[in-house]
Amino acid sequence: SCPCDANSCIMSATLSNEPSSRFSDCSFSLPSRFSDCSFNQYSSDIIHYHECLLNEPSRTDIVSPPVCGNYYPEVGEDCDCGPPANCQNPCCDAATCGLTTGSQCAEGLCCDQCRLKKAGTICRKARGDNPDDRCTGQSGVCPRNT
C-alpha cells in the first residue's frame, strides 16, 4: 500500500471520482502529489543514479528548429540566455543568441568571464575510476573523459 494525502496521486491507477476533486461534472481534477512509495523510489534513484543527471543533452538531440530566447543553446546558436529582458549573461547577445563582441564563450565549466580556460585546466575532479576532466581550450563545455 502506498498512501497519499491527496484524493489521487500522480501515477495512481485511477483518478478520484469525488465531486470535491472534479473540475466539472464531466472531468476529473489532475493529481498534484506523488504517493509515498513513488516519492521514496524517486529519492532513492536520485541518490544512487545521480551521475546521469550531469549528462547534458546534445544540441543535435533537439529535433525542432532553433528558437532564440528559450534558454537552451541549439544548433546554430552560440548561447541562449533567454529573452532580452531576462538575459543576465554579459557574454551572450540575447537578440541574436550569439556571443557579445570580444567574448570567446558564454557558459560552461571551461568558460570564465567570457574567456575560454586554457587547455588542460581541470574542470571536473576525478570520481571513482574516471580521470579528471580537462578543458580543451576550444569550448566552454567541460568534456567527459570516460
From Swiss-Prot:
Protein EC: 3.4.24.-
Molecular function, one GO term: toxin activity
Disulfide bond residue pairs: C2-C37, C4-C9, C68-C87, C79-C97, C81-C92, C91-C114, C105-C111, C110-C135, C123-C142
Tissue specificity note: Expressed by the venom gland.
One GO-annotated biological process of the protein: proteolysis
Main location: secreted
Domain Peptidase M12B residue range list: 1-57
Location relative to the cell: Secreted
InterPro entries membership: Disintegrin_CS, Disintegrin_dom, Disintegrin_dom_sf, Peptidase_M12B
Additional record remark: The disintegrin domain belongs to the long disintegrin subfamily.
Protein name: Zinc metalloproteinase-disintegrin salmosin-3
Native species: Gloydius brevicauda (Korean slamosa snake)
Lineage: Eukaryota, Metazoa, Chordata, Craniata, Vertebrata
